[in-house]
Each structure stands twice: as C-alpha cells, then as structure tokens.
C-alpha cells in the first residue's frame, strides 16, 4: 500500500467510528465472521485502489458526480484498525471512500437485503446504525446517495447505458438500483489507480451520486437502513432504486465500486454479513470501457461473496482492452484491496462492520470501476435469491464494457462465499476470462493477487470464515449475472434480486451474507442459479457454491439470454465443486470470461486465491459461444479446495497466440493463460473434472468465453494456501480472439510464478504451484511485478490428477514450462535484484536472505548493453565456477570484496580477457594457485589485502604474458611470511607494492630492491620500515635512488631492530644490493612504513573512463602494426573489421592535421620504398616519426579501400544483424564520442578521417566510387608504393611466414626467390649485426607499411582482398589441424614467390590431415552470399574457394581460450571459428599462448563487435592487444640486442616462460620449428660461417696448387725430363692448353722477365751457367792472389775463354 492509502485508512476509521450505526454493524459483522469468514472479493475493474486519502463526506457529496477513482477510498471501515490491517492499508484507504455514500445508500440497501429475504440483520440494529450514519453524514453526503441523484446520474450516464443496454436495467425497479448500490458499496473500493484515465474521468463526470450516488445509494442507504431494513431495503428499495440508478451507477460506479470494494471487503465482508443480500458485483467497465486497458480487481476476502457479471456484447474490443488490462490488473492486485483488504478483513467483527461501510462507501467508487458497477446490477438480480442462497452476481461488462473495454473487473469473496458468475460469451468471453482470473485472485483475498497478500488476508479470515464460510458459501451461491442486469436490461430482475440480496455488499454483501447466512444456508443452497433475462443471453453465468469457498463459474453462451438455464446448469456443477469446504474462509469468484472479457477482451484473466479451498471453474457453454458447451476439466486437490479453471483449450481457442499460467502458491495468485487455438474442441479435455478431496471447489467459467474475446490471451490466477487447483477450460467454438488478447499481460503483477506455456492444463499449473514457493504476502507485490520470479513454494498445493491432462492446442502453444520459469528466475532477474545501469552491475547492500552465494549468470537478453563494472561486494560468494564469466566478457572492473572466497584457481577468472581492476580484499583467501592471473593479460590493479594469505608460492604471478600492465599490487593485512614467487619481483610494470601489516622477512625486501627495477613506491611493515629508518642516511648515501620516508613513530622508536646487523653493515649483503640497484636502474624508489589506518582500497572513480593504452597516434598505429599482419594471415577483411574502430577517434582530430596528409604522401613513399630509407628516417626524424607513420597509414588505407573497390568486388562485410551496412557504417555514423576514447585514439583520427568522411560504409561501393575517382591524383604515389611494398612483403613472407612483423620484413633488401637456407647463407654480417634501434624501427615502421598494403591491395594482387584466397589458384582448402610435418613439407615445396598467395601457401596448397578437429566434423557453417566465393565451412575436409571468415553474429559471449588443440566439442560457431584461427596461425605464431590470444581477439572482433554499444570496448581491446604485442616484442628485442640474435628467435622461444616446464617445451618447439621454418640460432649460424669459410679456403688453396702444377709441367720440355712429382697424374694437354691460355692472357702488360720466370732451363744453359760461376770464382781467386806487378789486362787466352 502506498503511504497515501494509509492516511486514507485513518480517515476511513475515523469516519466509520464517527457513524453511529457502526457499532451495531461491527457486532453483526463479528458474529458473521465468527460463523464464516469469507475472503474479500477481487473486483477486477479498470479502477484501482487509490492512495488518495478519503475526503470528508461533504467533499464526497459535493464531488459526487466527479468522484475520482481514488475518491472511493472514503473512510469506509472505521470499525477496527485490525480489520483494516487485514484489508491492507490500501483496502482500508479505499473503503473509507464510500462512507459518505453510506448514509443514504445503506438504508435502501439494507432494506433491499431484507426484502430479498436474505438473513436480515436485526433491523433495529441496522436502522440505528444507519440512522446514526445519516445523522452524522452531511446532507451533501446524503444527496449523492439519494436515489434521485442516482437517477440523475443514470440520466447522465444514459448514453453509455444505451450503448451497453443499460436502458433495460434502468427500467428495472429501484430494487435493482439498490442492489447495484449495494454491489457498488461492496465493490466500492476498487482500485482507482488501476482505472484508465477515461474511467476516472467518467467517474468524475457523474454528479455527486456518480460515485456516491451509485455506490453510496447502494451501500450507504442500505447501511443506514441496515439495522432494520438492511436486507429488506436492499431487496426492495435497492432493487427498486437500482433500476433507475443502475444505468448511472453502472457506468460511473462500476469503477468506483471496484475501487472501493477492494478496500471494503476485508472489514466490510464481515459487516456485509449483516447485510446478507449484499453481493459483490464486478461490472466490467461498460461505461468506462472508454478506459481500455485498465482492469480493476476488488477483493473482499473476509466472508464476502463476489458477484461478477460481464456482458460480452460488443465487448470484443473491451475484451482486447481487458487482455491488455490484466497487465494493469496486476497493479491493482498489488495495491488493490486484494492485498490490502484481505489483511484488514481477517478480524471478523470489524470486517463485517466495515464491509457494510465499504458497501456504503463503495457506491462512491462504483463510478470508478465499471466492472463493479456491472457486478452490482448482477447483484441486484442476485437479491432475488434468498439471502441464504447469496450468490455473487457478476454482471457481464456489457454496458460498462462498452465504455471500459479494456478494464475488466472481478470481485471475489473467498471465505465461505459461493460465487456465481454469469457471463455472456458473446464477444465478452475475453472479459469474463479477465473477471475469472480476477475472481480467482480475489478468492485468495485482498492480497490474493499478490500471493503474500492472500496469505495475510486469507489466513486471518480463514479461521473464522472457514467455519462459517463453508456453510455460508454453500448456502450462498453467488450468481454472477451478465453485466446486462447492471444495465437493467436483461438481468434487471435477476440483478434486482441480486441487488436485494447483495445491494450494499456486492462484494461485502455477498461475503457478509455468506458469513451470516451461509452457516445455515450454505449447505442448503449450495447451488444458486441466477436466471438472467433474455437480455443477458450473451452473458454467461457461473454459480459457485463452495462449501467454504466452493466457487462455480458457469459462462453462458452469448445467444443465451436465458442465462438462468446456464446458471441452473451451473448450480448442478457447483454442488460438485462445493463438495469440500474451504479450510480458509476465502471464496473465489470468477466472473464469466465472456462478460468481462467481452468488455475487456484484451485482458482476460482468472485469478484464484485459495487458502484451503478448491476452486472449480466450470465454464458453461452458451449456445453462441460454444466454449461453455465443452465440459470443464476440474482437478481436485485431495486435501485442498479444488479450483477448476477454464479448459486451456478453450482459453487457447480464444487466446491461441498466447497462453500464460501464473501460479502463486499460498497467497500467490495463480494465473493461467493458455494459448487458445482456434479449435473450440479442447473443451472435451476440459470435461475431465476431479472432485476436490475435501475442499470446496471453485468453478470458473470456461476460459473459452473469455478467450473467445481474449482469443490471444487468457489469464487465470490462482492463489491457494494448502489447496489443490483444478482448472478446467472449455474452448469456445467461437473464437473471438482479439489479436491483442495475447497482450493481455497474462502476467499478474503480483504473481510470484508465471507459467506462460501451459496455464490451461491444471497439471502445469498445480505442479508449478507445488514447485514454486509462495512469497510472503508482504513480498508478493514485489514478486508479482516480475512474473518470471518464483517467490515461494505453495503451502500445500496438491495438483489434481486431471491437471496432467493438457489440451493439444495448449501444449502446442506453450512457450515455457514451469521449470523453465524457475530457471529463468535464477538468471533473468538479476537486474531486479541488483542494479543495472551505466555499464555497471551492482549487487551490494542486499538483504541477508537475498545475498548471492555464487556469481549470477544473466540471460543474454537481460541487459541490452555490456557490463564493464561488476560489483559483488558484501555477498556470500565462496566459490567461482568455471565459465561463469562468459557472460561478462567485456568486464574491466571486478569487485569481489567482502565475500567468502577461500582459494583462487587458474580458471577462476577465465573469460575476463579485458579485466583491468580486480578487488579481492577482505575475503578468506588462503591459497592462490599457479597461473591464476594468466587469463588476465591486461590486469593493472590487484587488491589482495585483508585475507589470510601466508605465502605466495612459486608461480602465483606467473603468466605467459608476464603481467605486462600490472602496476599496483596490494598485499597488506595478510599473515604473509614467505614470498617464493620470483615472478612477483620480475613484474615489469609494477610501480606500487603494499606489503604493510605483513610478516615478510628482510630477504623479500632484498629481492624487491634487486629485481623490481620499475618500482616507485614500497610500503613495508612498520617494524621493518622503522628499522631501515635508523640507517636512513647510510642507505640513501649508498643508493641515491632509494628514499626513505620515516614518520614520527619510526623516528622516536628505539626498539631493537632484528635486521640491524645486516642493514647497518656497510659491507653487508643489504648494502651490496643497494649498490647493485644503483647501477642498473635510475628509478627512484620511495619506501614508507604502513599507515596506522591504512586502507587498501583505491579510488578508481575514473576507471570507467580510462584512457586507451596508447595516448597518441603514433603509439596507436604502432600497436596496430603488431596485429594487422595476423588478420591478413587468416584472410580476414581487415578493412571492414578495423576501420570502424580506427575511425572511432577520428571525430576528435583537428582538420588542420588532416589536411597535412596530402603533403606528406611523398614521405610515405620514401618510407615504403625500402629499409635503408626507413633507417635514415628513423635516425633523422625520430621526433616526427609518429606523425608520418599515421599519415602513411592513412594514405595506404585510403588507397587500399579505393583501389580494392575499383579492381575487385567489394569484400563482404562482416555480418551484423543489427545493421545492414556493416561495421564501417556503425563506425562512421554512430561512433561514440567518449572523450577518453577520443583521446586514446587521437592518433588514428587523422589516419582515416577523410576516409571515414568520404566512405561511411564499405557495403555501398557504388557510393564510394565517385570519391575514389576524385582522389585518384592523391592516390597515385601511394598505389605505386604499395605495389612495390607488396612485392617485398610477399617475398619476405614466402621465405619466412613468421608472425612477428619484424621478422617478415627483416630482409627486404637482400630477399630473393630462393630457398630459406640459401637466403640465410647469403646474409651479410652487416644485416645480422644491425643495431637494436634499427631492428626496432623496422619492426615498427615497415610492418605497418606492409600491413597497409595488405589492406589496400586489389583482390587479385598480393594480399588480395586483405588475404582472401583466390578461387582460381586455390580451389580447395581442406582445413584441419596443421601438423608440423605438413608445415615443413609445405614450406619446402613452395619456396618460390609465385604471387601474393604464396605467403599463405602453407594453408592454401596443402591437404591437411583429418581427424585433428574431429569434434567439429559435423559443423558446417551456413554459406553466406558473397560475390567472391562461398563461406568458410569447417569440417574434417572442408572445401572453400575463398576464406571470408564471415560468420553470423553469434553474440557477445566469449568462450575461454582453448588450452590446446584437443578442443572439446564446441557449443557455438564462435568457438569453432576460434579453433580454426588458432590452427591457421600455428605456423605464424608458434607460441601457443600468443596464438590463442590473437585468435581470441580476432574472433571477438569478427563476431562480437558488431553492436554499437561495444564499439568503444572493442577498440580498447584491439589497442591493448597491440600494445601487449609491442611490449612482448620489445622484450625480445632487448634479449636479441644482448646476444645478437635474429628477431626470429622470439618465435622459437616463449616470451616469458622461464620455468623448467617452459624450457623443456621450448626445446621441443625449437626442433619442430627448425623443420617448419629454416632458422638458426646464433651458435648454429657461427658454425655455419666457419664451415663456409673453411670450404672457401680449401677451394682457394686447391686453385693455387693447380696453377702451380700446370706451370711446372712445362719443365717436361727439358731433355732430362723433369719429374712432375705429385702432379704427373694431371693430363698434359689440359695443363699445356691451360698454360697457353694463361700465357696468352698474361701477354698483355706483363714484363718479359716475368714471362720467363718459370720457364724451364735446358741442360746446356745449365752447364754454361755452372762453368761461368766456376770461372768467375776462379777469377776472383786470381785477383786476390795476383801479384801487384802483374799486368791487370787479361791475356788473350783469358779473354777468349771468357767469350762464350
């Protein structure tokens, strides 16, 4: 109840007590309640209870004609506050509204009751109380009640009355009017809030009597007269006055009555007992039908009978409205009297007293609730029956439906109330269904609609009313006459009677009468047949004679003006149904669906709330409707009352398109909405009826009638407390389903459980009730709002055997089963339990019983957007299941603080690829498994404080990616004593480490100082920090990069430091560590002691708007360069995939920067032409490198896009169900302009800004062509550059299909089309010895150039179609797991760069072995239309002409990355696609982990990034992935610079894996990779160089020896023959010829002496030389020995000898 309603209750109480007759009424009500407690009726009216406080009676009178729907809440039941409690605040509030009316209306109403012959309360008492009320009431209040004003009101309402057929009702005697008034009073507390505005307006329009007159006349007058003539006046005067007033009241009051009635039922139900003839009338909103879609339900649980009559005539529209109305109906149910009133009524005396008051006051509300008004006429007819035979007459909403087509109302008085519902199936069947549903709910009690309310309301009444209810209900048969009687046309006699009996308490009156008279009368008159005048031929009547709450509803066929025969038949059924008496006082009244549904065709609903009652719904087929003809299937619970609902087939027949069943056990309303099939025959199935075990049965009119009008939707709501529910539905041969009837929201707002698929079959319903747990009455309303949520198990709900029977049509139409609803409730309602919004799911501050025990898994459609922040703080989560994060793949921030986690496993966070913030503080974590954080490559922050971690074992922070982004780690407040994980100290980006309040030793500090070189802030335990502070000066002197911040506590602390000896020793290990740190890092480290109030939490308020990993264009483009080659390698359409994300930030760039692109195209050309120019540019223009790179990228991307469109068919766009134009359209037109993201991608803005502007969509090449032509001049250079770059890239990839960009383009300059081995041999040492900067530059620049060529090349050129395969060259591609053998064979075979496809020859030209991915053999992706080829089909031997990788959008779910190639059977095409990517990338990326990451990112980008809401997130993921690859590559470059190895090494070895396992695995991979891709380490290359050098040396030596040998062969000319030694074996001719050739060659430019150098000497010459030498020597001797006198001249002889 709203707060506004509570004041209304107070007002009501004050007024009730203010009235004199109330004490008498209270006494009588108490007496009646003791005998039989009848549940409040639900009045299913367009009007809902309003929270508005009751105005003074004067205001009522003054505004009688314009009573707002809320006004009905005038103080009605002042009797006892506890009565109000039973009713519920809303009920009480609503009940007060009628008091103004009650003064005058009660008197006639009481008289009517007396005249009707019902149990008259002691006339003196009633008269006294009513007279007192009259005296207290102002004349204005009396005026509205006066029949004259009522007549005036009918005059005003006459137009409506004519439409509905009110004319006849108006013609009916005043007794009918009084009856209506009584009914209005009983239904006086409708739910005004639920009334549609139109209804409210109408209610306002009538003069004072509109609400007051109608309801007040009926109720106030009878009550005023109650002491003496309560019964008489009701029967006579009300019947007399009613005819005149009915037309007015029926139109205006139905709503008000419905509104007021709910409030009144609780108390008034008991008071109504004083008015035995009071019936609860629910008039379908005939006049208020103009207010479509607003059904009101009024329930007076305590000892209240409900009369519901609905006319189907011309209510087909109304039925549709009603179908819609049920949606509103739930609203009414929650606030409405059902919940509110039911609780208030339990006290017997107050309820009786209040009921009468409510009846009096309810007239004010009848105007608001047309349904109630309708019921009132029916009630008028009902008075004709003896009070003992009190019937609840539900007038079909014929006339009122005309006005309130969409607002059916149902009144139910569960306890000891027999309910007769007569409804005309004509077009109103839908409405009647609504009434039936409403009635069913009403039976539960005020809160019946909301299951809890029923429990509250019902149970209190049950004890008293149960006893009384049984007999009273049986004796009193509430007959629901078609609303025509309300109109005073057809049912006028019946209505007059009903009114006479139930004039004041259409709802209460019946209940009160039931309570009063039922004890004696119930057994005798179990069946009450209300004959409907021929005018009501269309109305179906349902008589319910519960023992305690036997409820029989028999719908009459439209043609049947003779509803009475139908009702006669109905009585026959009611006795069966009456068999068990409800343990609970509650009675269920279901208006015939025909009547109410006719009026409210859109929203038929049957609500049955039973405490211990069986509810049997027997639809009586009218000749016209035919739905009544099929027998009802009744399921009788053995112990509990049996509820029979209209056969699902009937309901289905009319609601063929939708069937819903809502079951709310205990106080839960059971809503059954069967999908009616056109077949009317289902009724046969309905025929089956099981007698209730011992509980009264409630028979509802066949849902068929209601369905006929609500063809698309019928709703039955049953709220039992220990009851069995039997639902029998007869399909109407006539199916008049308004197409909107399905929309009738079968979902009662208060229903805890909704069984949509098979409501008709009681099996499903009762079963569902058993399965479902009934929510507490106080929580029912909340639960009702979510139909899928099941709040509690039914108390003791036993399904009848017949419930197993379901109509075929219903089974066919069933969409969900009860178990499915249960399942949905656990996952679908996360956003109801938690807070969803702004990309955040917050499940905090929950009640202890609601707190989460495990991570909730939402349904895919639960939330339209994505959750980037998950906050599960303060729950009871103790374990994290695997794959639980699959639905949260985009989460960046996860808070699991203050839960019960005890351990973390390596799969605890599997699937959170994008996670950056992880808060696990204040749990009970004791151990962390190795590789726990490996699934989180982008993690930046971890909070593990406030746990019970005692050690960090080896591998805790081990991950293949090395935790490259982790910069903050909090470990404080843990009993941490040992840190054995070296990976903690080696975290490359760690800048903040908090180890405060731990027990770590000094050794840990040493390791941190020595190994964690990037650490900037370290928080130590206070004792250790203070110990260091004692040597602050020494430490800072030794290592200037370490700064100690000592607080005052440390400076004054003189405690002995256990580490003093080690720290204070200048030559100790600690000082050496400091010196070593100073040598290899310049990062300043601040060491601080822990703060006394240290809080481990970190304020990340701006976390959601976090920047991308790269802040400028150069970084962004450079990061993309590391992943673009992989996209082309797997034949993905890079342009269509990446451009949307690259273009996202373009909106933030300045136009001036974009204009510089054209000027720098020449620079791009130079960049692309070769590595030499790149090196120069790198060294000369490092500062401008980023800008040029971006410009080059832009030019190349544009060229690629344009050239590709011109030369080849447009590549097929990534399929996006949400958009026809593809991702680029999204990116161009619906780009997020998030400032943070714009800044992050600021670099890419200029790159593709013109392109994004010029070609917003790649799916429209025709539009792009003109722009291509316009740019032809600008693209000239870029195209030529790309062509040359493509050739180099192709050659590179041909010889080395390696993943890393650096490797690919390492040898552009020297690459030749030869085998890999030959290429390696010819490498120049200079190339191998390039500086680290040069290699890094090549990796960053040239790869991206090549990638750009991949994007821009035409389909038939290198990297055609961005890697798409050509059908001509590779017609077949059998995809399977790539084995090393295949890769080796393929690479050796296809070494020549034949064309661009050679780079992918390892996949294109090979038949891969089968069986590797046998799990996927059955998967064949549906081919997609594409001009280039067929879609990629996966299988053991799948053939494809072109690998487009175009998959349907599977969703955003991301499966965990596969651990190996032995994948389990996959559940989605996305998983299979990822496997294929992994296999394709195997040769490019030998490292399994890197390969899986790249495959996963590509799969995400391809299949999960189509939605506009994930564009930014996808762009972030791409940027982070590229940044990660850049960091990993940089680390490998550092290693390469140290050991002079080639960049290919990174493929052979894992990046970070330094463990023994990684090393052993690395060796195996190295051997395999040597086979796959010829490549050698430094050692192998050195050996090879030495070998080559040796071979060359040997060759040179051999050559020299051969030449010498040839020269010496010439000595053979010597006569003596010169021995050739070892060379004599050489052929002579060969040697001579060679010598001649050599002589010929040497003849040019050689001196003569050199020619004869090796010429052999003849023997003569030798002898001559020897003689000369000998002679010379002898001559020298002579000269030395000659005497001085000797002649110096030689002798002639000597001279002659000397001559030759």
From Swiss-Prot:
Residues 1182-1191, 1201-1216, 1676-1685 have a biased composition (Basic and acidic residues). Residues 238-249, 358-368, 482-493, 729-749 have a biased composition (Low complexity). The chain crosses the membrane at residues 1583-1603. One of its GO terms (cellular component) is membrane. Belongs to the LRRC37A family. Its main location: membrane. InterPro entries: Leu-rich_rpt, Leu-rich_rpt_typical-subtyp, LRR_dom_sf, LRRC37, LRRC37_N, LRRC37AB_C. Residues 36-1582 are extracellular. Residues 1604-1700 are cytoplasmic. It comes from the Eukaryota. This is Leucine-rich repeat-containing protein 37A. Residues 1689-1700 have a biased composition (Acidic residues). Residues 54-65, 169-189, 223-237, 307-326, 433-446, 760-770 have a biased composition (Polar residues). Glycans are attached at residues 296, 1079. It comes from Homo sapiens. Residues 54-104, 130-156, 169-534, 559-580, 619-642, 685-708, 729-751, 758-777, 1182-1227, 1250-1271, 1676-1700 are annotated as: Disordered.
């Amino acid at each position: 109840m709203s707060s506004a309603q509570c004041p209304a209750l107070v007002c009501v109480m004050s007024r009730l007590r203010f009235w004199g007759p109330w004490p008498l009424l209270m006494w009588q009500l108490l007496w009646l309640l003791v005998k039989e407690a009848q549940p409040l009726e639900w009045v299913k009216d367009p009007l809902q209870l309003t929270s508005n406080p009751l105005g003074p009676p004067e205001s009522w009178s003054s505004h009688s004609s314009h009573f707002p729907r809320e006004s009905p809440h005038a103080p009605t039941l002042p009797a006892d506050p506890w009565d109000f409690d039973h009713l519920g605040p809303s009920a009480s509030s609503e009940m007060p509204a009628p008091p103004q009316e009650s003064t005058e209306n009660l008197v006639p109403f009481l008289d009517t009751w007396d005249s009707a012959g019902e149990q008259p309360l002691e006339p003196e008492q009633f008269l006294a109380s009513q007279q007192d009320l009259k005296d207290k009431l102002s004349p204005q209040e009396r005026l509205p009640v006066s029949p004259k004003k009522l007549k005036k009101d009918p005059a005003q309402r006459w137009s409506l009355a004519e439409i509905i057929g009110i004319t006849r009702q108006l013609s009916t005697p005043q007794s009918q009017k009084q009856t209506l008034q009584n009914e209005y009073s009983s239904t006086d507390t409708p739910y005004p809030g639920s009334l549609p505005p139109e209804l409210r307006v109408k209610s306002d329009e009538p003069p004072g009597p509109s609400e007051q007159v109608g309801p007040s006349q009926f109720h106030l007058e009878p009550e005023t007269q109650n002491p003496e003539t309560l019964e008489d006046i009701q029967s006579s005067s009300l019947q007399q006055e009613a005819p005149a007033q009915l037309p007015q009241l029926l139109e205006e009051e139905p709503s008000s009555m419905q509104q007021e009635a709910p409030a009144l039922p609780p108390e008034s139900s008991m008071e109504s007992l004083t008015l035995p003839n009071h019936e609860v009338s629910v008039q379908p909103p005939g006049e208020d039908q103009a207010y479509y879609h607003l059904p009101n339900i009024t329930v007076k649980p305590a000892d209240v009978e409900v009369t519901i009559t609905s006319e189907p005539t011309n209510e087909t529209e109304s039925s549709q409205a009603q179908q819609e109305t049920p949606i509103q109906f739930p609203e009414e149910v929650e606030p409405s009297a059902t919940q509110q009133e039911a609780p208030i009524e339990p006290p017997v005396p107050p309820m009786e007293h209040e009921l009468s008051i409510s009846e009096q006051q309810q007239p004010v509300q009848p105007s608001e609730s047309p349904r109630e008004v309708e019921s009132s006429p029916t009630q008028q007819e009902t008075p004709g029956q003896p009070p003992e035979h009190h019937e609840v007459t539900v007038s079909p909403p014929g006339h009122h439906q005309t006005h309130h087509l969409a607002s059916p109302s149902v009144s139910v008085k569960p306890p000891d109330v027999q309910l007769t519902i007569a409804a005309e199936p004509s077009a109103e069947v839908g409405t009647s269904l609504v009434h039936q549903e409403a009635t069913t709910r009403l039976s539960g009690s005020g809160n019946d609609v909301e299951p809890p309310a029923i429990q509250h309301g019902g149970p209190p009444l049950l004890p008293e009313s149960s006893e009384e209810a049984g007999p009273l209900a049986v004796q009193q048969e509430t007959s629901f006459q078609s609303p025509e009687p309300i109109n005073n046309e057809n049912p006028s006699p019946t209505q007059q009677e009903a009114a006479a009996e139930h004039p004041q308490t259409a709802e209460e009156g019946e209940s009160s009468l039931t309570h009063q008279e039922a004890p004696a009368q119930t057994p005798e008159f179990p069946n009450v047949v209300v004959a409907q005048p021929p005018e009501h031929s269309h109305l179906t009547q349902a008589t319910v004679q519960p023992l305690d709450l036997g409820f029989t509803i028999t719908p009459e066929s439209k043609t049947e003006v003779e509803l009475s025969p139908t009702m006669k038949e109905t009585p026959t059924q009611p006795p069966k149904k009456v068999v068990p008496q409800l343990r609970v006082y509650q009675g269920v009244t279901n208006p015939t669906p025909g009547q109410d549904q006719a009026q409210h065709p859109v929203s038929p609903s049957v609500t049955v709330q039973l405490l211990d009652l069986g509810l049997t719904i027997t639809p009586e087929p009218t000749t016209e409707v035919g739905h009544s003809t099929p027998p009802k299937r009744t399921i009788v619970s053995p112990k509990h009352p049996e509820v029979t609902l209209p056969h699902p087939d009937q309901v289905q027949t009319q609601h063929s398109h939708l069937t819903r069943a809502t079951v709310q056990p205990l106080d839960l309303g059971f809503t059954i909405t069967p999908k009616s099939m056109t077949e009317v025959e289902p009724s046969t199935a309905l025929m089956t009826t099981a007698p209730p075990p011992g509980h009264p049965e409630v028979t509802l009119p066949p849902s068929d009638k209601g369905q006929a009008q609500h063809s698309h939707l019928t709703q039955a709501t049953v709220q039992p407390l220990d009851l069995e529910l039997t639902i029998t539905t007869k399909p109407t041969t006539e199916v008049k389903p308004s197409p909107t009837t399905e929309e009738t929201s079968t979902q009662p707002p208060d229903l805890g459980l909704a069984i949509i698929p098979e409501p008709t079959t009681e099996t499903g319903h009762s079963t569902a009730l058993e399965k479902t747990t009934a929510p507490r009455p106080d929580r029912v309303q909340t639960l009702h709002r979510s139909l899928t949520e099941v709040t509690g198990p039914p108390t003791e709900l036993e399904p009848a055997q017949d419930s197993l029977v379901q109509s075929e049509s219903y089974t066919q139409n069933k969409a969900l089963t009860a178990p499915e609803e249960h399942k949905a409730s656990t996952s679908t309602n996360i956003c109801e339990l938690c807070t969803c919004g702004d990309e955040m799911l917050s499940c905090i501050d929950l009640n202890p019983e609601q707190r989460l025990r495990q991570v909730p898994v939402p349904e895919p459609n639960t939330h339209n957007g994505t959750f980037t922040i998950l906050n599960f703080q303060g729950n009871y989560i103790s374990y994290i299941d695997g794959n639980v994060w699959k639905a949260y793949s985009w989460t960046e921030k996860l808070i699991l603080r203050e839960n019960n986690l005890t351990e973390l496993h390596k799969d605890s966070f599997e699937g959170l690829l994008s996670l950056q913030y992880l808060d696990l503080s204040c749990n009970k974590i004791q151990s962390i498994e190795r590789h726990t954080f490996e699934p989180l490559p982008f993690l930046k922050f971890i909070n593990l404080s406030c746990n019970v971690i005692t050690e960090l074992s080896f591998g805790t922070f081990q991950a293949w990616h090395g935790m490259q982004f982790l910069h903050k780690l909090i470990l404080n407040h843990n009993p941490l004593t040992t840190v054995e994980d070296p990976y903690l100290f080696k975290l490359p980006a760690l800048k903040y480490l908090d180890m405060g309040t731990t027990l770590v030793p000094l050794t840990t500090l040493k390791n941190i100082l020595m190994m964690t070189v990037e650490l900037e802030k370290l928080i130590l335990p206070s004792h250790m920090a203070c110990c260091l502070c004692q040597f602050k000066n020494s430490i800072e002197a030794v290592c200037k990069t370490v700064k100690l911040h000592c607080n005052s506590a440390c400076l004054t602390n003189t405690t002995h430091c256990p580490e003093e000896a080690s720290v204070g020793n200048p030559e100790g290990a600690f000082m050496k560590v400091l010196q070593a740190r100073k040598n290899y890092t310049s990062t300043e480290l601040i060491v601080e002691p822990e703060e006394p109030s240290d809080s481990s939490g970190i304020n990340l308020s701006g976390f959601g708007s976090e920047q991308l990993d790269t802040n400028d264009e150069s970084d962004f483009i450079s990061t993309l360069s590391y992943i673009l080659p992989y996209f082309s390698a797997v034949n993905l359409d890079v342009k269509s995939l990446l451009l949307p994300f690259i273009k996202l930030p373009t909106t933030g760039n300045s136009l001036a920067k974009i204009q510089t692109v054209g000027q720098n195209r020449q620079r791009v050309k130079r960049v692309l032409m070769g590595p030499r120019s790149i090196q120069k540019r790198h060294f000369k223009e490092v500062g401008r490198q980023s800008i040029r790179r971006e410009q080059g990228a832009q030019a190349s991307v544009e060229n690629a896009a344009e050239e590709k469109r011109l030369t080849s068919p447009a590549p097929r766009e990534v399929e996006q169900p949400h958009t026809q134009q593809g991702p680029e359209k999204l990116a161009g037109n619906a780009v997020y302009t998030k400032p943070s993201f714009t800044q992050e991608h600021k670099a890419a803005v200029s790159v593709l800004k013109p392109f994004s502007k010029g070609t917003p969509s790649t799916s429209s090449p025709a539009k792009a062509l003109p722009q291509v032509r316009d740019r032809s001049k600008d693209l000239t250079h870029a195209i030529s550059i790309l062509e040359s770059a493509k050739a180099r890239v192709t050659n590179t990839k041909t010889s080395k299909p390696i993943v890393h960009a650096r490797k690919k383009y390492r040898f552009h300059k020297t690459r030749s089309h030869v085998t890999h081995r030959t290429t390696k041999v010819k490498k120049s040492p200079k190339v191998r010895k390039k500086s680290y900067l040069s290699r890094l530059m090549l990796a960053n620049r040239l790869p991206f150039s090549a990638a750009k060529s991949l994007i821009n090349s035409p389909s038939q050129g290198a990297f055609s179609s961005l890697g798409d395969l050509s059908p001509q060259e590779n017609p077949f591609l059998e995809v399977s797991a790539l084995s090393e053998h295949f890769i080796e064979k393929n690479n050796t075979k296809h070494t020549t760069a034949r064309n661009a496809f050679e780079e992918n020859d390892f996949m294109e030209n090979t038949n891969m072995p089968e069986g590797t991915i046998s799990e996927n053999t059955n998967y064949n992706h549906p081919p997609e239309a594409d001009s280039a080829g067929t879609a990629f089909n996966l299988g053991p031997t799948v053939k494809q002409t072109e690998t487009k990788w175009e998959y349907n959008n599977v969703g955003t779910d991301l499966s965990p990355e596969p651990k190996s190639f032995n994948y389990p059977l996959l559940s989605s095409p996305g998983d299979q696609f990822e496997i294929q990517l992994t296999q394709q990338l195997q040769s490019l990326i030998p490292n399994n982990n890197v390969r899986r990451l790249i495959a996963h990112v590509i799969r995400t980008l391809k299949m999960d990034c189509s939605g506009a809401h994930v564009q930014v997130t996808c762009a972030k993921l791409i940027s982070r992935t590229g940044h990660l690859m850049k960091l990993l590559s940089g680390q490998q470059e550092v290693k390469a610079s140290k050991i002079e190895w080639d960049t290919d090494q990174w493929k052979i070895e894992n990046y970070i894996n330094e463990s023994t396992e990684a090393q052993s695995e690395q060796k195996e991979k190295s051997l395999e990779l040597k086979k796959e891709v010829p490549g050698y380490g430094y050692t192998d290359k050195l050996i090879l160089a030495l070998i080559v050098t040796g071979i060359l040396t040997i060759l040179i030596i051999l050559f020299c020896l051969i030449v010498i040998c040839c020269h010496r062969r010439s000595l053979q000319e010597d006569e003596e023959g010169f021995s050739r030694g070892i060379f004599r074996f050489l052929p002579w001719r060969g040697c001579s010829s060679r010598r001649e050739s050599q002589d010929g060659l040497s003849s040019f430019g050689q001196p003569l002496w050199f020619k004869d150098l090796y010429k052999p000497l003849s023997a003569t010459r030798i002898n001559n030389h020897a003689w000369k030498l000998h002679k010379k020597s002898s001559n020298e001797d002579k000269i030395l020995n000659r005497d001085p006198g000797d002649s110096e001249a030689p002798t002639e002889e000597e001279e002659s000898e000397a001559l030759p």
